[in-house]
């Protein structure tokens, strides 16, 4: 089953969820605000996608961090610690496409998702 990780009020997550619904894709939504960031999943994402892609330096949460907190996130270990503490710095959505589907995607790209589903 497809699992979408993010926060429900994020515009990109809203678009992604609406798109999946329109495409008839069954998915489960994991709300970072209510359920937190599963450390073992984050470790998998870091291995698969890399911390540079996962760390959203363009978002409001990042901009609100003081420079000391931002400096901590200059390597994989520091970025991981920050992501566990401040889930909103994770680029969204993170989507696990299920076993055998080729790992994860970070962010929403309808064209890439269409191709991933074999519909493009």
Regions found by a protein language model. Give the residues of each.
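Thiol/selenol-based redox catalytic cores and closely related redox-interacting motifs
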Residues: 32-120
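Local sequence-structure signature of Cys/Sec-based thiol-disulfide redox active-site neighborhoods
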Residues: 1-23, 27-35
């Amino acid at each position: 089953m497809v699992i979408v990780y993010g926060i429900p009020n994020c515009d990109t997550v809203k678009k992604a969820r609406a798109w999946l619904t329109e495409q008839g894709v069954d998915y489960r939504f994991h709300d970072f605000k209510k359920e937190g960031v599963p450390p073992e999943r984050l470790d998998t994402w870091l291995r698969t996608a890399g911390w540079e892609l996962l760390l959203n330096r363009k978002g409001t949460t990042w901009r609100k961090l003081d420079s000391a907190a931002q400096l901590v996130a200059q390597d994989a270990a520091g970025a991981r610690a920050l992501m566990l503490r401040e889930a909103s710095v994770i680029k969204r959505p993170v989507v696990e496409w299920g076993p055998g589907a080729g790992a994860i995607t970070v962010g929403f790209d309808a064209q890439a998702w269409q191709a991933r589903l074999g519909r493009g």
